[in-house]
Amino acid sequence: MQKRHTDRESYFDEQSQTSKNYYIPYIKEVIGHIPDKVLEVGCGEGGNLLPFAEAGCRVMGVDIDATRIEQARTFFAQRHQQGQFIATDIFQLKDKATNFPLILLHDVIEHIRDKERF
């Protein structure tokens, strides 16, 4: 399990496959379509967002770790995909995170200290 978290590009690809094979089919089943805009809180390298971008969605990823955000930008650019990635605390994001019909939190909620505010 440690290797899976130290090889960030492999982890990116693993997350991408999870979204492609599970999240997107489930979302299509439940709401009938993929929303046009997707926000991921705690996006890391953005792997979960890649299949949404490939499907034509506007994607935004937010993570408190600036290194992960830089990796997200790099991994998306290498795959010729568009995405907006912001290194900040979700509570500092304010207006940029409004009007997203779909918000993902994959292995993140337990790291948010002020859950009441969230």
Language model features with spans:
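A short His-aromatic
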Residues: 107-111
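A short, conserved alpha-helix within the catalytic core of class I
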Residues: 112-118
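Conserved N-terminal segment of class I S-adenosyl-L-methionine
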Residues: 1-98, 102, 106
